[in-house]
Amino acid sequence: KKLEGLKRGDLVRVTYYDTYGYRSRTGILDEVLPAFKLLKLKDIAIDFDDIQDIELRGRA
C-alpha cells in the first residue's frame, strides 16, 4: 500500500530485512517494478516481501 503514489526521484527511507536482520536505508527512488516485486534505489534492489516500512522523505 505504501508504495502507491511513490515516484521516481522521491527521497525515501526504507526499512527492510536482509541476511543480517532489519536495516534502514535512505535514498532516491529509482523505480518500482510491480511485475518483479522490486523497489530499486540507486544501488540496491529490495524485494517487496522484505520491506517492513517505507517513508516518503521528500518529493522530486
Which residues make up each language-model segment?
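SH3/SH3-like beta-barrel fold
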Residues: 14, 37-43
